[in-house]
């Protein structure tokens, strides 16, 4: 009887520690999810306010912005150069998250997200990777995509074909 009691006591103790450990992990992810979500909201808010310095401080030094046009793949410095005139003229973008998902790597230093955004282009999708650098979440890669409802995809393809056929040939010839 004593062996059975010791065994069940051992199982109970292991179970409690497992539950507490899982709870701590969930609390950490919950805290980090809130931090990342706030960072992304503030990131979008800085763009809407045309606050160049604040907006670009959310990017890691080594980061990439991928825009809606197939030719728009910029490192941070190139994106800053491209965006500066828009910020100077206060003609920036205003994105508001409608729905956001955040996922974590096992090391808790990398996370990735996808979100649906309310924009001047209607619904867009923002997605990217963030890294915890010196205690702050920074954007490592951001991808902005225009969503296309399935019911109109054929019309959109027809509209862009003449422009993108040229680019397709250029890319194939490289």
Task: Describe each PLM feature range.
Residues 1-27:
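Bacterial Sec-dependent N-terminal signal peptides
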Residues 21-57, 150-153, 157-174:
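Short, low-complexity N-terminal intrinsically disordered segments enriched in polar/charged residues
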Residues 43, 55-56, 63, 79, ...:
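Hydrophobic pocket/interface hotspot
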Residues 59, 69, 99, 106, ...:
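A mature extracytoplasmic/lumenal domain signature
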Residues 64-74, 85-92:
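A short gly/proline-enriched turn/hairpin at secondary-structure junctions
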Residues 80-123:
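Surface-exposed, charged secondary-structure patches
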Residues 107-111, 122, 128, 132-133, ...:
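Extended, well-structured beta-strand/loop surface patches
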Residues 123-154:
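Short beta-strand edge/turn micro-motifs at domain boundaries
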């Amino acid at each position: 009887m004593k062996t059975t009691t010791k065994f069940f006591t051992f199982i109970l103790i292991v179970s409690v520690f497992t539950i507490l450990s899982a709870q701590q992990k969930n609390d950490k992810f919950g805290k980090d999810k809130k931090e990342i979500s706030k960072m992304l909201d503030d990131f979008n808010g800085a763009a809407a306010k045309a606050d160049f310095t604040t907006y670009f401080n959310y990017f890691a030094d080594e980061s990439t912005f991928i825009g809606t046009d197939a030719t728009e793949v910029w490192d941070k410095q190139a994106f800053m150069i491209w965006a500066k005139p828009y910020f100077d003229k206060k003609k920036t973008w205003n994105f508001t998250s409608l729905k956001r998902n955040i996922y974590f790597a096992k090391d808790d230093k990398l996370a990735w997200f996808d979100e649906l955004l309310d924009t001047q282009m209607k619904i867009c999708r923002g997605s990217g990777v963030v890294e915890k650098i010196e205690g702050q979440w920074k954007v490592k890669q951001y991808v902005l995509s225009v969503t296309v409802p399935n019911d109109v995809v054929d019309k959109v393809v027809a509209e862009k074909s003449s422009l993108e056929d040229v680019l397709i040939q250029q890319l194939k010839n490289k």
